[in-house]
């Protein structure tokens, strides 16, 4: 007997059965869908279970429980029952409310359906009434034919087949009403199916019945459903609620693109463009608008405007107000001014040689123009030397802006000169105290009193004439009066009480700048505030840099320079201009940004100054350029100040007929690029204290470009004036050489009319020009065709002699007319 007799094989029976269903879509599309049918497990209580084992039975008291414990348990049980009853009541109330809501909605739907059916019924009845009225009108219009037709169609008289056909036609005509009803009945389930589809999409599940229904057409997306629910929720909460407006601080530059403006306000670009169009501006999102228009738009959208400018990059330059407690005494800065050849440089050299240790290594460079000396009592003085020629007026003005005391040098044998007056005006404009140094008193022709008297004409009253301006008689050659001059300067400095804060970011002024071979751009800086140290990052004018080295006036490298100390600064990326302000900043990025902004601003300013703004100005400029001859030149100098001074002088040379145009001015040696520029424009190259390198010399020789070297600005100016004078047209002058009176007029064959004349004054020449005067009015000007004495052709006739004259191409001559004889000569002109 087997173990498996009467037993079934043990196995797992699947809880569900799978199958495939073909689902139909619109436009004839189908899809096979896998579905499964699950059987629901039903839980049935066991038959042996006691019906009285519920919570309602009295609990049995445990053997080890006390009365208090039992009391607590009973109270807890009663509380649980009470909560349970309350929960049941609440659930019943909620269920009742839900049922009422469902009933209300069903009532609304039924009311809408009834209203729709009534409307359709009224429309159907109206259509039937119109149809009956139309038929009645047709019947009245054709009563006789209708009567005949009705008689012929009478069922009593027609055969059975015709009666059936007529009955079928009548049924076809009267079947419109039931067909509409069937259409309405068929449309109603379609609405219900659509609602069912919405439920299916909302649930996200596909059942067997839904798959078999074949209703798989295009339906709304879940996002659309959610938007609809959100709108219904807002409507149920009391209408559309406006979202709270967020007010933003919008940074507004000088110009801004429309799209960027919309992004900063967090508004739609279309709304911003629409607002601009309302203001009359037809712009797109990629166009720029000015700050004023953008401000109106920002205020219209309810935001706040924060104006920013490109110049805000310079805000990083600290404008710190120094605390009086941090201020310390500083050396005075003395600027030596005066007329050329009055001994300014000689006086400074004498002071320096007298106060600087002999045998000093190095010494000041040729163009540093600033240095310090120490007096016998230990007082330090910083001197600035400004050139005396009139071309350096701008440099001298910049020197007066950084100076504390002006020493006006006047030669005792030359008195007050034009540039002395300029120096006085600069000192007065800068409101700087002045000390007069009367130099060259060692010469026999020296007259210091005349100098003091001449200064009175310019409101400079010295102490010897009961004024408040100190005057010292000195001699740079003999060294006379130098100590007294230094004492006067120190006394004036004590009166001024000069102080500065050394413990802050450095600020200074560029006295001179040059491009040095091997060292690059070098600037002589006079520190005015703070302390300049090695490694500091700074910006100066349109240039920036990092202090690579500091060199004092004695040629020594130093680590720092305090207030009123002149030093050479190495480490610039370009050559600044004399007078630019140096400021120390924190980072290299800030310095670069400030320098780039200043450079772009300077370019815009130059472009605006050089460009004609109207058509009339352009035409006038073009017309003037046609009549004005230009002398193009290229200027290279050793230092920036010299190049600037030469350019300013060149701009002043010329008149309404000729002018000098500086094609390029720079600092450093003459290079091949300078030669190429000069060759393209036909200009000479002028070098001031610089030379051309070997490639530049070879290029100039090959291209025929002239290079001239100068070390004195007078010679350069004179040569340029002479060259410009060569472009001037020569001046034509007339010299009257004689007068002749016509006594008789003769007609000569082959010649025409010939005037018999008497030379009354001067001389008559055959080659001279003549004018015919009648009643002292010029009626003809020309030349002589013939000049004869008796029958001979002669070159000239002296005064008191008679002669015959015939005019070239002119015969209207009468007795009594006067002939004026003159000669023309050309005189070369010079520029003053």
UniProtKB/Swiss-Prot annotation:
Q: What Gene Ontology terms describe what this protein does at the molecular function level?
A: GTP binding; GTPase activity; translation initiation factor activity
Q: Which residue stretches belong to region Disordered? A: 1-244
Q: Which domain of life is it from?
A: Bacteria
Cellular localisation:
Cytoplasm
Q: Does the keyword rRNA-binding apply?
A: no
Residue segments, region G3: 385-388
Where is this chain compositionally biased, Low complexity type? Answer: 142-171
For bias kind Basic and acidic residues, which ranges apply? Answer: 81-141, 178-201, 227-244
**Boundaries of every tr-type G domain copy:** 329-497
What Gene Ontology cellular-component terms does the record carry? cytosol
Polar residues: bias regions: 18-27
G5, as annotated region: 475-477
Region spans: G4? 439-442
Instruction: Tell me the InterPro entries matching this sequence.
Output: EF-G-like_DII (IPR053905), IF2_assoc_dom_bac (IPR013575), IF2_II (IPR044145), IF2_N (IPR006847), P-loop_NTPase (IPR027417), Small_GTP-bd (IPR005225), T_Tr_GTP-bd_dom (IPR000795), TF_IF2_bacterial-like (IPR000178)
Annotated region described as G1, given as residue ranges: 338-345
Please name the Gene3D superfamilies in this protein's record. Answer: P-loop containing nucleotide triphosphate hydrolases, Translation factors, Translation initiation factor IF- 2, domain 3
Ordered alphabetically, the record's keywords are:
Cytoplasm, GTP-binding, Initiation factor, Nucleotide-binding, Protein biosynthesis
Q: Name one Pfam family in it.
A: EF-G_D2
List ligand-binding residues for GTP: 338-345, 385-389, 439-442
Q: Which PROSITE patterns match?
A: G_TR_2 (PS51722), IF2 (PS01176)
Extract the ranges annotated as region (G2): 363-367
Protein family per UniProt: Belongs to the TRAFAC class translation factor GTPase superfamily. Classic translation factor GTPase family. IF-2 subfamily.
Official protein name in the record: Translation initiation factor IF-2
| Source species of the chain | Dinoroseobacter shibae (strain DSM 16493 / NCIMB 14021 / DFL 12)
Q: What is the lineage of its organism?
A: Bacteria, Pseudomonadati, Pseudomonadota, Alphaproteobacteria, Rhodobacterales
């Amino acid at each position: 007997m087997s173990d498996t007799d009467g037993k079934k094989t043990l196995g797992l029976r699947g809880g569900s059965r799978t199958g495939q269903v073909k689902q139909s879509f619109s436009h004839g599309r189908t899809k096979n869908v896998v579905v499964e049918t699950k059987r629901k497990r039903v839980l049935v209580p066991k038959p042996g279970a006691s019906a009285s084992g519920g919570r309602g039975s009295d609990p049995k008291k445990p053997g080890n429980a006390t009365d208090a414990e039992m009391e607590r348990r009973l109270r807890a049980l009663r509380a649980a029952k009470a909560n349970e009853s309350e929960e049941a009541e609440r659930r019943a109330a909620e269920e009742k409310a839900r049922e009422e809501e469902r009933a209300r909605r069903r009532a609304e739907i039924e009311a809408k359906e009834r209203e729709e059916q009534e409307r359709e019924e009224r429309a159907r009845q109206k259509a039937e009434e119109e149809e009956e009225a139309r038929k009645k009108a047709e019947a009245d219009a054709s009563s006789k034919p209708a009567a005949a037709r009705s008689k012929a169609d009478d069922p009593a008289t027609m055969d059975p087949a015709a009666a059936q056909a007529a009955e079928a036609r009548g049924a076809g005509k009267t079947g419109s009403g039931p067909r509409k009803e069937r259409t309405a009945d068929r449309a109603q389930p379609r609405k219900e199916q659509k609602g069912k589809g919405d439920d299916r999409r909302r649930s996200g599940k596909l059942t067997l019945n839904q798959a078999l229904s074949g209703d798989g057409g295009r339906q709304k997306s879940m996002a659309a459903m959610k938007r609809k629910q959100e709108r219904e929720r807002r409507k149920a909460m009391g209408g559309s609620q406006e979202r709270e407006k967020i007010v933003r601080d919008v940074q507004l530059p000088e110009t801004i693109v429309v799209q960027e403006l919309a992004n900063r306000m967090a508004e739609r670009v279309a709304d911003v463009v629409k607002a601009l169009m309302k203001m009359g501006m037809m712009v797109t999102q990629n166009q720029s608008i000015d700050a004023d228009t953008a401000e109106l738009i920002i205020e219209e959208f309810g935001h706040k405007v924060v104006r920013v400018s490109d110049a805000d990059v310079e805000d990083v330059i600290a404008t710190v107000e120094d605390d009086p407690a941090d201020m310390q005494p500083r050396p005075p800065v003395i600027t030596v001014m005066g007329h050329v050849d009055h001994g300014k440089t000689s006086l400074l050299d004498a002071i320096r040689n007298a106060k600087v240790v002999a045998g000093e290594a190095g010494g000041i460079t040729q163009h540093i123009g600033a240095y310090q000396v120490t007096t016998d009592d230990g007082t330090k003085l910083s001197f600035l030397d400004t050139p005396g020629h009139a071309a350096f007026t701008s440099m001298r003005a910049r020197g007066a802006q950084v100076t504390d005391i002006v020493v006006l040098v006047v030669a005792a044998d030359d008195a007050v000169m034009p540039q002395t007056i300029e120096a006085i005006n600069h000192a007065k404009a800068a409101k700087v105290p002045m000390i007069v140094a009367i130099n060259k008193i060692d010469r026999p022709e020296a007259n210091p009193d005349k100098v003091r008297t001449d200064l009175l004409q310019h409101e400079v009253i010295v102490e010897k004439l009961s004024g408040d301006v100190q005057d010292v008689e000195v001699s740079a050659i003999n060294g006379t009066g130098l100590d007294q001059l230094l004492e006067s300067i120190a006394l004036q400095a004590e009166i001024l009480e000069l102080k500065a804060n050394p413990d802050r970011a450095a600020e200074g002024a560029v006295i001179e700048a040059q491009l040095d071979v091997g060292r690059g751009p070098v600037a002589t800086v006079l520190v005015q505030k703070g302390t300049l140290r090695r490694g500091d990052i700074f910006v100066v004018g349109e240039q920036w840099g990092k202090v690579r080295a500091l060199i004092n006036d004695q040629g020594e490298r130093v680590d720092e320079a305090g207030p009123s100390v002149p030093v050479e600064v190495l480490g610039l990326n370009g050559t600044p201009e004399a007078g630019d302000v140096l400021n120390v900043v924190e980072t290299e990025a800030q310095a670069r940004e400030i320098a780039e902004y200043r450079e772009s601003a300077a370019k815009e300013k130059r472009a605006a100054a050089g460009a004609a703004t109207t058509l009339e100005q352009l035409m006038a400029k073009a017309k003037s350029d046609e009549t004005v001859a230009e002398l193009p030149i290229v200027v290279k100098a050793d230092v920036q100040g010299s190049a600037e001074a030469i350019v300013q002088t060149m701009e002043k040379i010329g008149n309404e007929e000729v002018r000098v145009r500086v094609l390029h001015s720079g600092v450093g040696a003459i290079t091949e690029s300078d030669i190429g520029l000069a060759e393209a424009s036909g200009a000479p190259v002028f070098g001031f204290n610089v030379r051309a390198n070997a490639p530049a010399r070879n290029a100039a020789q090959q291209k025929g470009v002239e290079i001239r070297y100068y070390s004195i600005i007078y010679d350069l100016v004179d040569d340029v004036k002479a060259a410009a004078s060569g472009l001037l047209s020569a001046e034509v002058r007339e010299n009257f050489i004689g007068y002749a009176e016509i006594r008789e007029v003769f007609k000569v064959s082959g010649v025409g009319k010939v005037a018999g004349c008497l030379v009354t004054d001067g001389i008559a020449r055959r080659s001279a020009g003549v004018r015919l005067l009648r009643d002292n009015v010029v009626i003809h000007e020309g030349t002589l065709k013939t000049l004869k004495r008796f029958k001979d052709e002669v070159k000239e006739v002296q005064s008191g002699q008679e002669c015959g004259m015939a005019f070239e191409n002119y015969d209207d001559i009468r007795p009594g007319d006067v002939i004026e004889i003159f000669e023309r000569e050309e005189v070369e002109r010079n520029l003053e």
